[in-house]
A protein has these predicted regions:
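N-terminal glycine-rich anion-binding loops that anchor highly charged ligand groups
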Residues: 20-22
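Divalent metal-dependent catalytic cores for phosphoryl transfer on phosphate-bearing substrates
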Residues: 8-12, 35-109
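Generic N-terminal amphipathic, Lys/Arg-enriched alpha-helix
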Residues: 1-15
Length: 109
């Protein structure tokens, strides 16, 4: 997916405020990647995608995790604020067919 396609997908899932936050993260990730010699486009993509599931209801996040075969640890199960990162990574793999593990891993963290 291109950055623009990812951006449109993210926009569908987030509030305007959180979408703006993701745009800012993408810009800062690209700046840091440029400075430290990392892949600028991958950093930008990971930045825009990092919170794609943040505004998704917890029940739907949990369904995405279960449907993806992800088993949460006890600590993860008790802390719903952790779910969006793992659900986001699963969503990228499943719904968006993102296969770049560096991007998926960055979203999962």
């Amino acid at each position: 997916m291109t950055f623009e396609q990812c951006e449109q997908e993210v926009k569908r899932h987030l509030t305007d405020k959180r979408f703006f936050h993701s745009q800012c993260v993408a810009a800062e990730a690209a700046r840091l990647a440029q400075r430290y010699g990392a892949d600028v486009e991958k950093a930008r993509l990971a930045g825009i995608l990092h919170d794609i599931m943040k505004d998704t209801p917890p029940e739907q996040q949990l369904k995405i995790l279960r449907d993806s075969g992800i088993i949460l640890t006890k600590t993860q199960s008790r802390n719903r604020k952790l779910w969006h990162a793992l659900a986001g990574a699963a969503y990228l793999r499943g719904a968006l067919s993102v296969s770049d593990e560096e991007i998926v891993s960055a979203v999962a963290c």
